[in-house]
């Protein structure tokens, strides 16, 4: 455990940020799974939006976001 006051604060903030990041990533995965279970235009838009939000927040790399969206788009076109 941290001894310095600023380190204690940073540790607390890290825990909070980790929870936010985990929730955002989980929401992205849930949206993708919902689309894969039942491909539709509406679910594609929701999944694509979730991927973009995760990429903007730095949770996933931009190339992974692009790759995931391309795969979803290909599945929608089928």
UniProtKB/Swiss-Prot annotation:
Pfam families this protein is in? Ribosomal_S20p (PF01649)
Q: Which residues form a coiled coil?
A: none
Q: Which GO terms describe its molecular function?
A: small ribosomal subunit rRNA binding; structural constituent of ribosome
- Per the UniProt entry, what are the Gene Ontology biological process annotations, in alphabetical order? translation
What keywords tag this UniProt record?
Ribonucleoprotein, Ribosomal protein, RNA-binding, rRNA-binding
Is Ion transport a UniProt keyword of this protein? no
Note whether RNA-binding occurs among the keywords: yes
Its Gene Ontology cellular component terms are: cytosol; small ribosomal subunit
Q: What is the similarity comment for this entry?
A: Belongs to the bacterial ribosomal protein bS20 family.
Function, as annotated, reads: Binds directly to 16S ribosomal RNA.
Q: Under what name is this protein listed? A: Small ribosomal subunit protein bS20
To which species is this protein native? Streptococcus pneumoniae serotype 2 (strain D39 / NCTC 7466)
């Amino acid at each position: 455990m941290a001894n310095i006051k600023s380190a204690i604060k940073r540790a607390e903030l890290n825990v909070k940020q980790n929870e936010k990041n985990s929730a955002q990533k989980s929401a992205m995965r849930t949206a993708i799974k919902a689309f894969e279970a039942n491909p539709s235009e509406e679910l594609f838009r929701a999944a694509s939006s979730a991927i973009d939000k995760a990429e903007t927040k730095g949770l996933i790399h931009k190339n992974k976001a692009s790759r995931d969206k391309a795969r979803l788009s290909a599945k929608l076109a089928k």
